[in-house]
């Protein structure tokens, strides 16, 4: 197995595991990519990622992948303040890699919004955000709830693998 393929497989394995370990899709994807590529995730970024697992719009897995791409190619605040022009090359790379990741989501799930991904996985959007929906979700058969997390774990697995593959491809250029 090539080194690149090994890293992609590691990210996929960690993605499946980390959805539950880190309590959500966005931090799960971010941490799977970070642990695979030795990216440093600080407390503030990790804390912020929880908000992207809140069924608020974009798929949290996509957000976690984009955050990892930002860690890899972004410019830190201190460097940006010293030289605002330093972000031009970084921004161009980020546009290319995030577009590639969005495209993977669109191809696999028909879009990159949380409700589009859920509709592809479950045939409908499962949004336990209102009191009624949360109550109904809590009353679901435990096997169905396990199935829900299993399917969501597959998205985290894919997102982490795609993100690592796209980063490694960009690094080769």
Regions found by a protein language model. Give the residues of each.
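Phosphate-handling active-site elements
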Residues: 36-46, 72-97
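Acidic-glycine-rich active-site phosphate/pyrophosphate-binding loop
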Residues: 2-5, 29-48, 131-134
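Amphipathic alpha-helical interface segments
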Residues: 26, 31-33, 69, 84-173
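Polybasic, low-complexity association/targeting segments
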Residues: 1-18
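Active-site nucleophilic cysteine motif
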Residues: 22-28, 59, 63, 156
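Conserved phosphate/anionic-ligand binding catalytic regions in large, soluble enzymes, centered on
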Residues: 53-67
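Short secondary-structure capping micro-motifs at structural edges
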Residues: 16, 48-56, 89-90
């Amino acid at each position: 197995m090539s080194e690149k393929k090994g890293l992609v497989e590691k990210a996929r394995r960690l993605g499946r595991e980390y959805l539950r370990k880190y309590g959500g899709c966005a931090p799960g994807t971010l941490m799977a990519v970070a642990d695979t590529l030795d990216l440093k995730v600080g407390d503030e970024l990790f804390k912020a990622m929880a908000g992207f697992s809140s069924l608020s719009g974009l798929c949290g897995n996509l957000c976690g992948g984009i955050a990892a791409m930002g860690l890899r190619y972004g410019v830190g605040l201190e460097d940006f303040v010293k030289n605002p022009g330093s972000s031009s090359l970084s921004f161009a790379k980020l546009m290319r890699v995030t577009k590639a990741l969005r495209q993977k989501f669109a191809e696999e799930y028909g879009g990159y919004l949380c409700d589009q991904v859920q509709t592809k996985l479950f045939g409908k959007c499962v949004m336990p955000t209102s009191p009624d929906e949360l109550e109904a979700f809590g009353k679901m058969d435990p096997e169905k709830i396990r199935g829900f997390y299993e399917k969501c774990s597959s998205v985290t697995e894919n997102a982490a693998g795609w993100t690592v593959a796209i980063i490694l491809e960009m690094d080769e250029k």
